[in-house]
């Protein structure tokens, strides 16, 4: 099944990019050549780009801004005292604007406390091409966006620092080219890349893609970087000041390639686009979620890789090591590029709460143990029962294990936890045959497992807590047994 899945995924990617790398020549430069090889060639058609401005959250048509026609600024309700947020869509497989555009427009316009001008760069006629041709057109579209911003600067004294470009997929690189085409020492304020496109951009130099040099502040959300045949829909490499990789960035919860065949049977080849868009477009919905649920901001934490993050080793917010994903990110100037990871839910609101648990075991048996545990957490707001605990390796003598646990609810301050060794027929038999008598003072005790101390760190609040067994006279943990742990005054383990 795994091999068939790999093949189907590779075929999906080939169809997605429609490039000569998969044996589909498009009459342009071969796939894999960087943009520098084609940038001198003109696009296959005259640029057809519209700049639309939206008056309110229900506006679906927009009003067209025309550079060098100042009357359109008044007609479209442009307010020079408010920032300008421009949305830039990506490659198109059907020649239609995607429905998420109206969602993000509505979310931006509905924030009355932070009024902004909301616009759209409609380059659909240049995006509805073979992928390699659309890639070539991104530089031209970026230059046209820069021309619009320069005109606003000259005619309205509108500072480029008040501009925020939000680009999805190929649109992210359009944003980068717009920023780099502005000229002068001053840069536009912010660029947000929503799963910036990978094919023909991965591994290229900064001037051939979105990079931190293109704006005062650049952030990117990577949601579909899973590679097959050396290709990934979204770019994998960091390209911003803050690069967020939700759930590791390779794929997203709720998006299943295993359902591809079922979707094709039900919806035809359109199912291929739907399956890919689930993970690729998740970046957009995470950004919209940050606008619609400003009280439930997703927090990303700087980490070297997803494996370390999954062990809970990176929940540190010192020196800008954590930040909010999405619209309300803290914009820190002149920051060294940071790679951040986080876990999300499969649907909006996407926020989860991250906790690091460090559990100190003492194994009194001779061989490593791999039992199954669950933990119940009691907070000041909520209680969550029977969270499965996966250690990833056998328990050896006197060792501390670190793991990441995420909660869908805010439980408040953690005040007590219950740690249970879940029973199984195998472990019951093992326990009955290998237990031995140990003398401890004058009372007999059975050799087994002791959970000595549990250290907890809450990622979102940065609070550290230490928990010790409630009954210090009975430390042994046996199958089916549950131990209560309460806060104690031991020094938190770093």
From Swiss-Prot:
GO biological process, one term: response to hormone
PROSITE patterns: LIPASE_SER (PS00120), PLAT (PS50095)
Active site (UniProt): 169, 195, 280
Positions annotated as glycosylated: 79, 398
Principal localisation: secreted
UniProt-listed Pfam families: Lipase, PLAT
Function: Catalyzes the hydrolysis of triglycerides and phospholipids present in circulating plasma lipoproteins, including chylomicrons, intermediate density lipoproteins (IDL), low density lipoproteins (LDL) of large size and high density lipoproteins (HDL), releasing free fatty acids (FFA) and smaller lipoprotein particles. Also exhibits lysophospholipase activity. Can hydrolyze both neutral lipid and phospholipid substrates but shows a greater binding affinity for neutral lipid substrates than phospholipid substrates.
UniProt subunit comment: Homodimer.
Gene: Lipc
Keywords: Glycoprotein, HDL, Heparin-binding, Hydrolase, Lipid degradation, Lipid metabolism, Secreted, Signal
Record-annotated PLAT domain positions: 353-487
GO cellular component terms given for this protein: cell surface; early endosome; extracellular space; high-density lipoprotein particle; late endosome; microvillus
Mechanisms controlling activity: Phospholipase A1 and lysophospholipase activities are inhibited by annexin II.
Classification via InterPro entries: AB_hydrolase_fold, Lipase, Lipase_hep, Lipase_LIPH, Lipase_N, PLAT/LH2_dom, PLAT/LH2_dom_sf, TAG_lipase
EC number, UniProt record: 3.1.1.3, 3.1.1.5, 3.1.1.32
pH dependence (record): Optimum pH is 8-9.
Region (Essential for determining substrate specificity): 255-278
Subcellular location(s) of the protein: Secreted
Family from the record: Belongs to the AB hydrolase superfamily. Lipase family.
Entry's Gene Ontology molecular function annotations: acetylesterase activity; acyltransferase activity; apolipoprotein binding; chylomicron binding; heparan sulfate proteoglycan binding; heparin binding; identical protein binding; lipase activity
Annotated signal sequence range: 1-21
Name assigned to this protein: Hepatic triacylglycerol lipase
Organism of provenance: Rattus norvegicus (Rat)
Catalysed reactions, semicolon-separated: a triacylglycerol + H2O = a diacylglycerol + a fatty acid + H(+); a 1-acyl-sn-glycero-3-phosphocholine + H2O = sn-glycerol 3-phosphocholine + a fatty acid + H(+); a 1,2-diacyl-sn-glycero-3-phosphocholine + H2O = a 2-acyl-sn-glycero-3-phosphocholine + a fatty acid + H(+); 1,2-di-(9Z-octadecenoyl)-sn-glycerol + H2O = 2-(9Z-octadecenoyl)-glycerol + (9Z)-octadecenoate + H(+)
């Amino acid at each position: 099944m795994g091999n068939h899945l790999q093949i189907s995924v590779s075929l999906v990617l080939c169809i997605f990019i429609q490039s000569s790398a998969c044996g589909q020549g498009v009459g342009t430069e071969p796939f894999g050549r960087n943009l520098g090889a084609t940038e001198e060639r003109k696009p296959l058609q005259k640029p057809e780009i519209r700049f639309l401005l939206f008056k309110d959250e229900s506006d679906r048509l927009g009003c067209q801004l025309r550079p060098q026609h100042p009357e359109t600024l008044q007609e479209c309700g442009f307010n020079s005292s408010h920032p300008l947020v421009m949305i830039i869509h990506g490659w198109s497989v059907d020649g239609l604007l995607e429905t998420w555009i109206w969602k993000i427009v509505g979310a931006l316009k509905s924030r009355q406390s932070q009024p902004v001008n909301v616009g759209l760069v409609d380059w659909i006629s240049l995006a509805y091409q073979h992928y390699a041709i659309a890639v070539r057109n991104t530089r031209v579209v970026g230059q046209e966006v820069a021309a619009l911003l320069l005109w606003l600067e000259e005619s309205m004294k509108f500072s480029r620092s008040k501009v925020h470009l939000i680009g999805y997929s190929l649109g992210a690189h359009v944003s980068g080219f717009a920023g780099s085409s502005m000229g002068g020492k001053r840069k536009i304020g912010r660029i947000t890349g929503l799963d910036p496109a990978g094919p023909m951009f991965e591994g290229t130099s900064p001037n051939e893609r979105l990079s931190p040099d293109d704006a005062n502040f650049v952030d990117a959300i990577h949601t579909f970087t899973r590679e097959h045949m050396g290709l990934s829909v979204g770019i994998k490499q960091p390209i911003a000041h803050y690069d967020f990789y939700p759930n590791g960035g390779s794929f997203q919860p709720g998006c299943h390639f295993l359902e591809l065949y079922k979707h094709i049977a039900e919806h035809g080849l359109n199912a291929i686009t739907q399956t890919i868009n689930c993970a690729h477009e998740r970046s957009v919905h995470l950004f919209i979620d940050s606008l619609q649920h400003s009280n439930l901001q997703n927090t990303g934490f700087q980490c070297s890789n997803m494996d370390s993050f999954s062990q809970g080793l990176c929940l540190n917010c010192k020196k800008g090591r954590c930040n909010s994903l999405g619209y309300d990110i803290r914009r820190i100037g002149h920051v060294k590029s940071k790679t951040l990871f986080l876990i999300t839910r499969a649907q909006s609101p996407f926020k989860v709460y991250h906790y690091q648990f460090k559990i100190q075991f003492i194994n009194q048996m001779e061989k490593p143990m791999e039992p199954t545990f669950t933990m119940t957490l009691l907070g000041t707001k909520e209680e969550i029962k029977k969270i499965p605990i996966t250690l990833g390796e056998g328990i050896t003598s006197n060792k501390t294990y670190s793991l990441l646990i995420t909660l869908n609810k805010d439980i408040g301050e953690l005040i007590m936890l219950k740690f249970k060794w879940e029973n199984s027929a195998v472990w019951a038999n093992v326990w009955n045959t290998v237990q031995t008598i140990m003398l401890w003072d004058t009372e007999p005790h059975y050799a087994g497992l002791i959970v000595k101390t549990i250290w907890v760190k809450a990622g979102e609040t940065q609070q550290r807590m230490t928990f010790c067994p409630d009954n210090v006279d009975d430390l042994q943990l046996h199958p089916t047994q549950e131990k209560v742990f309460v806060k104690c005054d031991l020094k938190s383990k770093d």
